Amino acid sequence: MSEFDGPIEEFPLVSVDRFDKENLNSTVYLLSHCHADHMVGLDALAFAERLKYKSLKLYCHRVSVALLKSLPLYNHLYPYLVPLDTDTPVTINVANEDGSVCYLMELTLIASGHCPGSVMFLLTSLNSSVLFTGDFRFDVGQAGRLKALQNFSKDAQLQIDNVYVDTTFCKESAEVIPKREDCLEVIFDAVKRWIEPAKDRKNVLFVNKTRYGYEFLMKALAEKFNCKIHVSDQQYSLYKYLPSIQQFMTLEADSTKIHFCKFKPGADNNLQIPCQHSLGFYPDVLKIIPTAMFFTKAESSPNSLVKAVIEKTIRCCYSTHSSTHEVVDLLSSINFKKLTPFVRPDRETSIDSVRSLLFEKLKAYKPELVQTENNKPSENIKEGLWSKPLSFKRTGRGCKRRLSSEKEAKEVEKLQNDEFNKDKNLNAEVERSLETEVERSPVDLSMAL
């Protein structure tokens, strides 16, 4: 569960994944993905009015735009959404409250592997750089191959000032979580053993509480067993602007043996499956709970990927968040100055202890890395090329520049003049194409996941 407050310290007037309280003073908003803990305040009237009356924008991946457009709670935000693609840097004018340009920011989206549309944000300016991971799941070695982070790789000269990192499973008991591919094989085997006798009454129900996020699993099941996956009406309508996802789903309960449909509030407790009345018979149902949290607890067996709960109900290991080792692998592949975890793996663990754990693990990769009281690198770490001071100072609800030299001031002024019209044209073009892009262009699911 994300505990991030929203403002990016190094980039004044920019807020990520939080849209209430002090974030209503920002002028640039970023959404990493459409899970509730990253959308606090997004449905509030105050935020909608902020966007409308100040002509502000919310930037996110185009898959997230399609999802927000399909949700009644958020579709009123559609005119203010700017759809972006991964690995395509865009320049954004970060404005003061009065609309004047405060500074220029380059934004790059990086696919994060958590769910459809989920991305990391790489923010850079003349003097600052930040990586906000959002929720992510990377394999070991994957981070080192990311084009967007090459300038900050361990062999490069530049450093990221702050890494805001997903630490959902950063604890000793979650040092390693099996790859999704390995977990899929276990799930495939469980499903096959249950439905292969080809008895009509045999059905499998996957139990999960999230609105979305298991599309990769559903797609894999559909391809493996050459069938569509039954979902509820509400789930199906969520993907009406994403045909590449909707194509492996069905509303016909009796046309498949694999179900992701959900029980409605107040449903009959005697039902074995939400769609039981539509099946026309009393089904024999195996319930599968895809989960990682259970398998990271001390009492679970580290060598088991499946665990029986009660009769005809099993838990299967499946994670959409990175393990401790995978998080450390990401951090070890880049140069950074400061580390800001934004998730506590459990109630007993503090953010400070999570940070300490990661620094301890990182010493194996970077012996020179020393955690100081201020979470800054030790003196023997080389400074990045962007280490020259160019600070921002808030004045009322805006900010002003303090430039380290007259030459730098002129350089910034020239950049602002050159880029301002370019950025205005970019935003206008994005807005004009938004209506047709989401509806006409099927989303490549492999890219989004």
Mark where each language-model region is.
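His/Asp/Glu-rich metal-coordinating catalytic cores
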Residues: 1-24, 28, 37-200, 208-211
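Short, surface-exposed beta-edge/turn micro-motifs
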Residues: 13, 202, 283-285
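Conserved beta-strand scaffold positions in the cores of enzyme catalytic domains, especially
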Residues: 15, 81-83, 229, 285-287, ...
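Conserved G/P- and acidic residue-centered "switch" motifs that form tight phosphate/ATP-binding loops
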Residues: 33
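Residue-level signal for threonine
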Residues: 61, 232, 291
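Cap/insert and terminal regions of metallo-dependent hydrolase folds
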Residues: 140-239, 299-376, 381
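C-terminal regulatory/interaction regions
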Residues: 239, 243-449
